[in-house]
Swiss-Prot record:
There is a cross-link at K30, K38 (Glycyl lysine isopeptide (Lys-Gly) (interchain with G-Cter in SUMO2)). This is Serine/arginine-rich splicing factor 1. Phosphorylated by CLK1, CLK2, CLK3 and CLK4. Phosphorylated by SRPK1 at multiple serines in its RS domain via a directional (C-terminal to N-terminal) and a dual-track mechanism incorporating both processive phosphorylation (in which the kinase stays attached to the substrate after each round of phosphorylation) and distributive phosphorylation steps (in which the kinase and substrate dissociate after each phosphorylation event). Asymmetrically dimethylated at arginines, probably by PRMT1, methylation promotes localization to nuclear speckles. The modification Asymmetric dimethylarginine is found at R93, R97, R109. The modification Phosphoserine is found at S2, S133, S199, S201, S205, S207, S209, S231, S234, S238. Residues 93-108 have a biased composition (Gly residues). The modification N-acetylserine is found at S2. The gene is SRSF1.
Amino acid sequence: MSGGGVIRGPAGNNDCRIYVGNLPPDIRTKDIEDVFYKYGAIRDIDLKNRRGGPPFAFVEFEDPRDAEDAVYGRDGYDYDGYRLRVEFPRSGRGTGRGGGGGGGGGAPRGRYGPPSRRSENRVVVSGLPPSGSWQDLKDHMREAGDVCYADVYRDGTGVVEFVRKEDMTYAVRKLDNTKFRSHEGETAYIRVKVDGPRSPSYGRSRSRSRSRSRNRSRSNSRSRSYSPRRSRGSPRYSPRHSRSRSRT
């Protein structure tokens, strides 16, 4: 997931474009950017604020995977008392269409469930701070290779699945006992170990709440399939504080 900022350029395809409705009457383009910038580089924001009708907007990302994350993370988001409606335009794709991007594809998934693309190359992570989200964990573990699934649980543990076994092995060797930083700036040293026989509890009772309310938006637990691989080396940490004026 790349950095924020609006990049003006030629229009892309509908996979990168999302619809944002139920906006407050005094909404500005900059406010919309503040709500969505953390999901990735924004190519364009087209705010429609016609007199006599409620405002709405189209936001276009550089990467279709960032658009998918924005739909999942911000649909139903409470912005100054307005519950945002965020979806792909009806002329484009639907949110239930494939399980990810990056050339990997994937099986269809439910809107609120993780993608069906899974891997046996799984590690268990412990010692996560309370504000650590699946996206924070995924970003941290990408230093080892291509992550196809990540999730976090209430007890400070998480699971990460890699596309390749060698990346899983590398993650245990290089990321065990490293400093983890959440999007809220909390830090902790985490432990990374190869998972044993799969526990049926993962992904159910121990999963963090998927509440989409303003004060729990960090807990949206959904993984997009396949992630671009970063070069191996020392992990990079960049806390992502939301600049939205809708704060807790």
